[in-house]
Amino acid sequence: MAVRLTKNELKRQKETLKTFRRFLPTLQLKKQQLYAEIRAVEARASEVRSRADALRQDVQQWVAVFSESGVFDARLLRVQEVKKTYASIAGVRIPCFLEVHFACPPYDLYRVPLWVDTAVRKMQEVLSLDLEAHVLDEQALLLGAELRTTTQRVNLFEKVKIPETRACIRKITVYLGDQQVAAVVRGKMSKKNLVDVSRMEQEDTR
């Protein structure tokens, strides 16, 4: 796109450069914040999964008992609702895990072995941790998408917009400087011509 080599355009380009320089630090700070948040979310997800894996190992004995006794009912682990809230991090709306409700049907305590309550509770804890880790994965995905967009904007400002604007300013400044020098030269030449004409007229009158 051609740039108008005028004083007004020079002023406009300088204002544009000032705007870019004002917004760039904000974008860079947002990029750093998003990166730190993603690392923190990934660390929390890893910690939650470690707890779930440890508990899952403990649950394996109950799974074996369920299989042998035939008392296992899949409805005991049916998820009724996953309660979430939402928060804003660096302008990104992300889900936050609160709790999970299970639709556990009532069962006859006299007919079901005593260990069923403990086994169901532990297995529900595992599922709850798995669901929490899933929500943390959602957070990381949303923050990651925003980080990519912000990084693209930072690169656009740093590598394209600011260098282009500086180049335009230099081009206009050089052109206007050349025009000013040319105007001074023309002025001096005009003055010299006037002096020469005046001298010649004086010589003719003698």
Swiss-Prot record:
A GO molecular-function annotation: proton-transporting ATP synthase activity, rotational mechanism
Keyword Ion transport part of the UniProt annotation: yes
Q: Does the keyword Nucleus apply?
A: no
Q: Which UniProt keywords apply?
A: ATP synthesis, Hydrogen ion transport, Ion transport, Transport
Task: Fetch the InterPro entries from UniProt.
Answer: V_ATPase_D (IPR002699)
User: At the top level of its lineage, which domain of life is listed?
Assistant: Bacteria
GO BP terms in the entry:
proton motive force-driven plasma membrane ATP synthesis
Pfam families per UniProt: ATP-synt_D (PF01813)
Q: What does this protein do?
A: Produces ATP from ADP in the presence of a proton gradient across the membrane.
* Similarity-based family: Belongs to the V-ATPase D subunit family.
Q: What is this protein called?
A: V-type ATP synthase subunit D 1
**What species does this protein belong to?**
Treponema pallidum (strain Nichols)
Which gene name does the record give? atpD1
